[in-house]
Amino acid sequence: MFNNSIHKVSICIALTLTFSANAMAVTEIPFWHSMEGELGKEVDSIADRFNQSQPDYKIVPVYKGNYEQSLAAGIAAFRSGKAPAILQVYEVGTATMMASKAIKPVYQVFKDANIDFDESVFVPTVAGYYTDSKTGRLLSQPFNSSTPVLYYNKEAFKKAGLDPEQPPKTWQELAADTAKLRAAGSSCGYASGWQGWIQIENFSAWHGQPIASRNNGFDGTDAVLEFNKPLQVKHIQLLSDMNKKGDFTYFGRKDESTSKFYNGDCAITTASSGSLASIRHYAKFNFGVGMMPYDADAKNAPQNAIIGGASLWVMDGKDKETYKGVAEFLQYLVKPEIAAEWHQKTGYLPITTAAYELTKQQGFYEQNPGADVATRQMLNKPPLPYTKGLRLGNMPQIRTVVDEELEAVWTAKKTPQAALDNSVKRGDVLLRRFEQANK
């Protein structure tokens, strides 16, 4: 009896030790990101399902603030030897990450993990933003890519006597529509998020105009800024005139306009396609999604939109097992059913051709009119060498410069020409600083 009890206790101890050993064998992989609200919930959901799908790795998502904050936190953590394994970085941080010496290229991560990963699964216009210009290999993995789109309140349109199924196609139409919307009682006719990305960078690409020389920096770090040309100045003048009339309202440098839209304050906003998740969740009215407006007088417009959003960078200095887990997770993210779900639930672009095709097969676009607008904008025309994106050093700081200068326009302290001229002048100083630091 006594010996039998000892035997049972021994078995229990052995099982406990076995389970403990198995638990200890799980490799935790920190994943720092900037997805909050509904987007953060979806990141957590995907990570949980990956963790449950296998016993060896545990992805640990950690929200680290907005894009600027998470990039700064990631670089600082790398310098102190405490970097996460995966860091989500917005698209304008690409040149900074490439020059940081803090990363392990994604293609190398897969190679070292003995995973035969086909980089051609990604939509070319998305992957091209994150590839090495010389080798064409992926440096980071596309994740939440977006383009700006136009959201409009169908009920406000109807009240103003406008066709709720016809969003404005040109900036001239938008200006006329917002005046009618305001007259019909809308406190805010039009607002825009991410003004540098939407009103300068994407406006330029959408009209077939370069943002900088050297094909927007893809061909070298000696690029200079070029967005102070007549077409861009004319556009900012139109917004300035609308602002003076009260038809365009400026709420901030990031996506503040999104909440103003889904709260019903603003009848129209231009914002990231990735804002669709929160708008769909919070809006208590019927809304529509339209393409970005274009200048009716511009030749050959619209051209193609350029992506925003972010990609996933793998940080250097981790052990072999961590990189194996990272590779497994990155491969999991591009499974057609996972990538399609991420696209459908968030409004971000389908990053793989298979995800796009699966979404079509499932009838998602037919059931959700407007959900394919971002994709159609990106594929509207084959990109020109200077409309496939931008790769400029110190771009986060350049965006801050643009924000400061445009704010001077909205407060009537500067003319559009003076503001854009000064943006280019100040921005070029930042480009030369980056060029010198990375020779």
UniProtKB/Swiss-Prot annotation:
Leader sequence residues: 1-25
PROSITE patterns, alphabetized: SBP_BACTERIAL_1
A single GO BP: transmembrane transport
Top-level taxon of origin: Bacteria
Any single GO CC term annotated in Swiss-Prot or TrEMBL for this entry: cell envelope
Assembly: The complex is composed of two ATP-binding proteins (UgpC), two transmembrane proteins (UgpA and UgpE) and a solute-binding protein (UgpB).
UniProt main location, coarse: periplasm
Entry's family note: Belongs to the bacterial solute-binding protein 1 family.
Disulfide bridge partners, by residue number: none
Listed name of the protein: sn-glycerol-3-phosphate-binding periplasmic protein UgpB
Organism, as annotated: Yersinia pestis
